[in-house]
Amino acid sequence: MAEKLGILGRKVGMTRIFASDGSAVAVTVIQAGPCPVIQVRNGETDGYDAVQIAFEEAKEKHVTKPARGHFAKAGKGLFRNLREIRLEAPAEFEVGQELTVSLFAAGEKVKVTGTSIGKGYQGVMRRWNFAGSKDTHGCEKVHRSGGSIGNNTFPGHVFKGKKMAGHWGDERVTVKNLEIVDIRAEDNVILVKGAVPGPKNGLVLVRKQ
C-alpha cells in the first residue's frame, strides 16, 4: 500500500509554547532529518514503488559489510537507521537527495509512528483497566485477578483475543492527525501538537497525512 513521504527523527521530549492568544500549547519536540535517499525502487525492476531513506551517521564498525556496500552506492556515508517507504510516484526522487523538515509546513497535519514504551508483564487491572474483585467479604487472594476466562465443558477453551495478563507496550504505534505547530529549519526541529509514541530519544517516522 502506497504511503505519503516522511522523514525519520528522534523524539527529544515534550514542552509547551504559547500561542498568539496567550494559550499554552503542549508540543512534542522532534529532531528530524536530514535523511538522504539511499535507493529508489520502481515497479519494473523491483515489483513495487518505494524510497529508502537513512538517518543518523554511524561508524564503520557498527555497520554490517552488506549494508556498507548498499550505502556506498548512494555515496552519502554510513548510517544507523534505514527505512523504506512505499510511494505512488518515487520517480521524482533521486539517490543522494536529502530530505529535511522543509517537506512540511506549520499547520499541516502529520502522522507519527514510533515504538511505545515497554511496561513489561502486567496484570489485567493495569493492562486492560479491569475493576478487580472485592477487597473484603469473603474475597481471598484474587483481589486483582481477571475473574472467569470461559466455561468448562463448553466451549472448553479460552477464546482467542480474551483480555488477560501479559506483556504490555513495546509495540509499533501510529498516531494520526497531529498538527505541526512550528518548524525550526535551522535546527532540523519539528514541534508537533500533543504526544507521540515512544520514550525520549526514541526513533520516530513523521509522514504527511
Curated annotation (Swiss-Prot):
Disulfide bond positions: none
One Gene Ontology term, aspect cellular component: cytosolic large ribosomal subunit
GO molecular function: rRNA binding; structural constituent of ribosome
Highest taxon, organism lineage: Bacteria
Pfam families with a match to the protein in the record: Ribosomal_L3
Biological process according to GO: translation
Gene3D superfamilies: 3.30.160.810, Translation factors
Role according to the record: One of the primary rRNA binding proteins, it binds directly near the 3'-end of the 23S rRNA, where it nucleates assembly of the 50S subunit.
HAMAP family, alphabetized: Ribosomal_uL3_B
NCBIfam families on file: L3_bact
Similarity field: Belongs to the universal ribosomal protein uL3 family.
Subunit structure: Part of the 50S ribosomal subunit. Forms a cluster with proteins L14 and L19.
Protein name, as recorded: Large ribosomal subunit protein uL3
